A protein has these predicted regions:
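Membrane-interfacial helix-loop segments of redox and metal-homeostasis proteins
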Residues: 1-347
């Protein structure tokens, strides 16, 4: 059953790589270029998963309540720090895995420091700090429980909001983008060459995220997609050799790497690229902040931003805007401010 995690990861890695589904870029572009198309795509993926999740619960296929007590202080700090980290690293947790599979050496560095700090925050010297901050919580888990309503009201609201913005974007006049003459035909062209629409990728990601629930639960792991915990588990296993760290999630993240590599290689996008020393140092620092932030917040942009939001936990919906805010702060100091200073000098 653990191998279903590998299959799920391969599919997710392939779709994210071919669809260029970058959550860091999603958050950053909302501020830097005032483009929210990819954020609408993220909402679409959340919505697809949310509808399916509560349907599976309704018919008895899933009998889980994955939300934890809301560790508000750790979530607020962690999500903000994580948002800063993903800009410096050049990709979120999943994005770092799939960019590493494309041959980006900076992402290799970010991935290593992210995995290392995630492990240190769990069972290493910073474990006590993490536990202390996470222990400051309130017994409020899901938004619908807090307000005493059916989760279907929130599903309906999310669906309406998402449908409105999807329709709004699809109603805009399409802009033809210049493209090279296709070298492939048929299925090969569609899979490895044709540019994927973000909303198409989002639906696929939502379906994969939904499928992850019963597949993961069948192995005793009561959660869906998750990146930070499994990434830490790999590091802990390599250090201790203890097989208890190997679970469905570990196979998932390894599958993401494999699927991304397949997508990059087949589409001629794989190339080992060595950045300058400054970029490597920035990537390493970004990975450190990602590991610290995601562990404190109880999840990354996938665990919190895609999965926890789908079942309407307080953790998910509080961490999402804070991750975005952290991304915007980092984007200001690394992109906006340098551009303004350059323009001021030129004038």
């Amino acid at each position: 059953m653990l191998l279903t995690g590998l299959l799920c990861g391969i599919l997710l890695g392939f779709v994210m790589q071919r669809g260029r589904f970058c959550i860091t870029g999603t958050f950053r572009d909302m501020y830097v270029t005032k483009n929210n198309k990819m954020f609408v795509a993220l909402l679409l993926a959340i919505t697809v998963q949310s509808i399916g999740f509560f349907l599976l619960k309704e018919i008895g296929v899933l009998n889980v309540d994955p939300a934890e007590n809301f560790a508000f202080l750790a979530v607020i700090i962690g999500a903000f720090v994580f948002g800063i980290g993903i800009v410096l690293a050049g990709g979120c947790a999943t994005g770092t895995w799939y960019r590493a599979a494309e041959g980006l050496v900076g992402s290799w560095v970010a991935l290593f420091t992210y995995m290392l700090l995630s492990a240190i925050m769990r069972t290493g010297p910073l474990g006590e700090l993490n536990q202390t901050l996470r222990s400051i919580n309130i017994e409020q888990r899901n938004i619908y429980d807090t307000f005493g309503i059916s989760p279907w009201w929130l599903v309906a609201l999310l669906t309406l909001v998402t449908a409105f913005y999807v329709y709004k974007h699809l109603s805009k006049p399409s802009v033809k983008v210049a493209a090279l003459k296709p070298k492939k035909t048929g299925l090969a062209h569609l899979l490895f060459e044709k540019r994927w629409h973000p909303f198409f990728s989002a639906v696929l990601i939502g379906l994969i995220a939904l499928a992850a629930w019963p597949l993961s639960v069948a192995t005793g792991r009561e959660f869906g997609l998750g990146i930070t915990g499994p990434s830490a588990n790999i590091m802990q296993f390599l250090v201790t050799g203890d097989g208890k760290f190997i679970n469905w999630g570990v196979f998932l993240v390894l599958g993401i790497f494999i699927g991304s590599f397949i997508g990059a290689k087949a589409s001629n996008e794989f190339r080992v690229r060595v950045p300058d020393a400054t970029t490597i140092l920035r990537s390493g620092l970004g990975g450190i902040l990602m590991g610290i932030g995601a562990t404190l917040a109880g999840g990354c942009s996938i665990g919190n931003g895609l999965v926890e939001t789908a079942f309407f936990s307080w953790q998910g919906w509080v961490s999402l805007p804070l991750m975005i805010f952290g991304t915007w702060v980092a984007a200001y100091f690394t992109i906006i401010r340098p551009q303004r200073l350059k323009l001021a000098k030129a004038s």
